Amino acid sequence: MISQINNEERDYKLEAYDYFLDPSLIASKPSAIRHESRLMIVRNSVLEEDCLTNKFTKNLLDEFREGDLVVVNNTKVMKARLKVELENRTLVELLVLERSDECVWLCLAKPAKKLKINRKLKLKSPSEQDINLMVDGVDEETGGRFIKFPENITDLNSMNNLLDKYGEIPLPPYIKNSEEESFHENSYQTEYAINPGAVAAPTAGLHLSKSLISNLKKKGVIILPITLHVGYGTFKPIDQEDLTNLKLHKEWVSVNKEVVEEIKRIKKTDRRIIAIGTTSVRALESCYSHEINDFIPIAKYVDLVIKPGYKFRVVDGLLTNFHLPKSSLLLLVSAMIGRERLLDLYKKAIKEKFRFFSYGDAMYISPDSLLEKNRFKL
């Protein structure tokens, strides 16, 4: 059926964002040196060399210009995966997502069917005191469980303190290796992660080493942080075929006054704003206010959907990973350079054995490749 409709209509069909990936190209480990991961550089499609595949992320030093604003997401992945014990000593896994009410937190559970309402759980650790929990309800939207924690676990800080003692880093299920937990505690965090609250890493930032960041600053590149706590919705599969009225998850975003003022200055010049990761794109684009037609600081949950047809107001370029088929992240990148071109680039990446997903290689969408029709004229 999809083959019988035009390309613009196909942009709004989930099936049009599917592709085949050999499982051997799914990265289970990161590059040994962050800035040595491979980099595909995407340029304007009219250029003879519209795609470079022989680069590494350290070559971003040649791509970014003096005066460019590079925006990073400084969220930190919490040890949000907990193993709890039922009365019969059966183990169940929880993934803590967000606070629901007072000391009640929404968690995904595996296997969820064992967690009936009012069932008691015990959180155990070899070096810590046992903690009693209870199932308080069922969330119809996610299929998760509302779990009642001790009365003092009422905010993100107190929960993060508990998770630091009892939890583990929640790696995506496709990362299968025998590395120690301590390995992922470092490798699955960006070098600038300081604000705990995410349940998944903003993975494009994993490519930026301390030395690369230092060299970019020496060149005159401005690097500023935003915070977007990556939530469950980032990796939740899209469950509707028609994307016309797509609604996505909410995520907590903070963009401060310093970043907003820099955006306003840059938009009056020929300087550029480059986002490190799709989460930074979502945060930056969310700070535009339609009511006053201007950029404003924000600290709130946002549910912005970026898909083909979206007009970018803030972002000019993007460093990103290679994303899962049929994902909201694939829609976002397609909004920048077009779905067909993006899928052609993915075919090229697969042919040249680039590594995919969270620990994989990177793609840099240079500002000259962003389609003019997708830029909002301020």
Curated annotation (Swiss-Prot):
HAMAP family with a match to the protein in the record: QueA (MF_00113)
The family this protein is said to belong to: Belongs to the QueA family.
Role summary: Transfers and isomerizes the ribose moiety from AdoMet to the 7-aminomethyl group of 7-deazaguanine (preQ1-tRNA) to give epoxyqueuosine (oQ-tRNA).
Pathway: tRNA modification; tRNA-queuosine biosynthesis
Main location: cytoplasm
Protein name: S-adenosylmethionine:tRNA ribosyltransferase-isomerase
Keyword Electron transport among UniProt keywords: no
Coiled-coil segments: none
UniProt keyword annotations, A-Z: Cytoplasm, Queuosine biosynthesis, S-adenosyl-L-methionine, Transferase
Intracellular or extracellular location(s): Cytoplasm
Gene giving rise to this polypeptide: queA
Reactions catalysed: 7-aminomethyl-7-carbaguanosine(34) in tRNA + S-adenosyl-L-methionine = epoxyqueuosine(34) in tRNA + adenine + L-methionine + 2 H(+)
Gene Ontology terms: biological process: queuosine biosynthetic process; tRNA wobble guanine modification
GO molecular function terms attached to this record: S-adenosylmethionine:tRNA ribosyltransferase-isomerase activity
InterPro entries on file: QueA, QueA_dom1, QueA_dom2, QueA_sf
Quaternary structure and partners: Monomer.
Keyword Transferase recorded: yes
Lineage, broadest ranks: Bacteria, Bacillati, Cyanobacteriota, Cyanophyceae, Synechococcales
EC code(s) of this entry: 2.4.99.17
An annotated GO cellular component: cytoplasm
